[in-house]
Regions:
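N-terminal targeting sequences that direct proteins away from the cytosol to non-cytosolic compartments
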Residues: 1-292
Length: 292
């Protein structure tokens, strides 16, 4: 279990972090592109990237707004920053903009003064209402962690940590199943979330689910953790040689955990080109849980 933020829901995705109202839903559009909505009504859009543009903040902002003008076919004009955006000015260079003639900002370009990350914020119709009523999510917006801190991820109702050398590769957020794949130079890690677990377990046994999602024919063991299964495989020397010739990762480790109190199943599946260290599996298991 992972503790939730006191007055909201933590979202931490690929370097960006903020706390949003509990009733908001998060839609992942791309590796660095999120949309937040309530009752199927979009409210806020965030896109970000590490800066590859030359020049100072003013030149970078001008280049981004010129591109936005092409995308939207609307004239982009600078406007005065609204009060909710004011909380960002200690950390970011902030340039609010309007698409057309609206006096209220339609969004803003932020450039971090510390790491030069560029964040594009877009507001949707009705934004004025929730900015007036809700706690300001921009007060919690951050794009980098203190040096030596392992990256934290929090999406939907799960949270986990990874070592710095892993990067996001692919993801799937389907009804009842989430799958997020990370890669390093030698190891792949897949995080699974099955919800509601009770629905999946009516259709298949826990062991069948374990084998299906991990594509495993290796022996399954009972884990030391309650309601958990684990499987591990180390290849024979000839298997290892053949796997390396075909650039496959022959070492595997899988773990599935049923959390009846949350009606969730959380899974981990690792493949590696070398033996998987116990320290890594302990780290991943200890930091993977449901946000309560």
């Amino acid at each position: 279990m992972v503790e939730s933020e006191e007055q909201g829901k933590l979202i931490a995705w690929n370097g960006l972090r903020l706390v949003i109202p509990q009733q908001w839903e998060t839609i992942v559009r791309d590796k660095r592109h999120l949309i937040f909505e309530q009752d199927l009504h979009p409210l806020l859009e965030l896109r970000w990237q590490r800066s590859t543009l030359s020049g100072d903040s003013e030149k970078k902002t001008a280049a981004i707004l010129a591109q936005l003008e092409k995308e939207t076919s609307n004239p982009v004009t600078h406007v005065k920053s609204s009060a909710p955006l004011g909380a960002l000015q200690k950390i970011y260079d902030v340039a609010a903009f309007s698409l057309g003639t609206a006096g209220f900002p339609d969004g803003a370009v932020l450039i971090c003064k510390s790491c030069a990350t560029i964040i594009l914020i877009r507001f949707f119709s009705g934004t004025e209402d929730w900015l007036a009523k809700e706690s300001n999510p921009f007060q919690t917006l951050g794009c980098h962690l203190p040096q030596g801190t392992e990256p934290t991820w929090a999406i939907q109702d799960i949270s986990f940590q990874l070592l710095e050398d892993f990067h996001l590769d692919t993801y799937t957020f389907a009804f009842g199943m989430s799958r997020i794949l990370f890669k390093s130079s030698s190891t792949d890690v897949i995080f699974y979330r099955l919800a509601p677990a009770s629905t999946h377990l009516k259709q298949s046994s826990f062991e069948e689910l374990f084998r299906r999602f991990n594509d495993s024919t290796h022996p399954i063991e009972k884990s030391d953790r309650e309601h958990s299964l684990v499987s591990r495989h180390s290849p024979h020397p000839l298997q290892y040689l053949l796997a390396r010739l075909s650039r496959k990762k022959p070492f595997t480790w899988s773990h599935f955990r049923h959390l009846p109190e949350y009606d969730r199943i959380l899974g981990l599946h690792l493949t590696a080109s070398h033996p998987i260290k116990q320290e890594l599996t302990i780290f991943l298991l200890s930091n993977y849980g449901v946000i309560s």
